[in-house]
């Protein structure tokens, strides 16, 4: 699974049940960057070392900004089903 990034929306990931690992890095650190898909607001890239890593649990949240590439759903540490909500927040506070 590759790191993804968005141009028009911040992501707010809120875990309701289970646990989920994530990885983050600056988009400036990405290699092998895909073409930007503006219609779907996404592009992908790779980075092997120096990633920020963590685990989301119920009550925790993660906000990823437009300059932060992210990968979630890497593994589920407790092996259980993950239930979460992802909110898309328009950059600048309004839809473009």
Report residues per predicted region:
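A short beta-loop-beta micro-motif enriched in histidine and acidic residues
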Residues: 1-10, 28-33, 49-50, 56-58, ...
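Glycine- and acidic-residue-biased ligand/ion/polar-headgroup-sensing regions
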Residues: 8-10, 14-20, 24, 29, ...
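Short, acidic Gly/Pro/Ser/Thr-rich loop/turn segments
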Residues: 21-22, 71, 94-95
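Conserved metal-binding segment of the jelly-roll/cupin
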Residues: 55-73
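A short hydrophobic beta-strand segment most commonly corresponding to one strand
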Residues: 61-63, 79-96
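Short proline/glycine-enriched turn/loop segments at secondary-structure junctions
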Residues: 74-78
């Amino acid at each position: 699974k590759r790191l993804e990034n968005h141009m028009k929306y911040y992501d707010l990931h809120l875990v309701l049940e289970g646990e989920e690992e994530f990885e983050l890095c600056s988009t400036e650190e990405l290699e092998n960057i895909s073409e930007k898909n503006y219609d779907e607001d996404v592009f992908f890239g790779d980075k092997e070392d120096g990633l920020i890593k963590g685990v989301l649990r119920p009550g925790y949240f993660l906000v990823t900004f437009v300059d932060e590439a992210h990968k979630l759903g890497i593994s589920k540490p407790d092996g259980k089903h993950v239930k979460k909500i992802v909110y898309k927040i328009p950059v600048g506070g309004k839809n473009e």
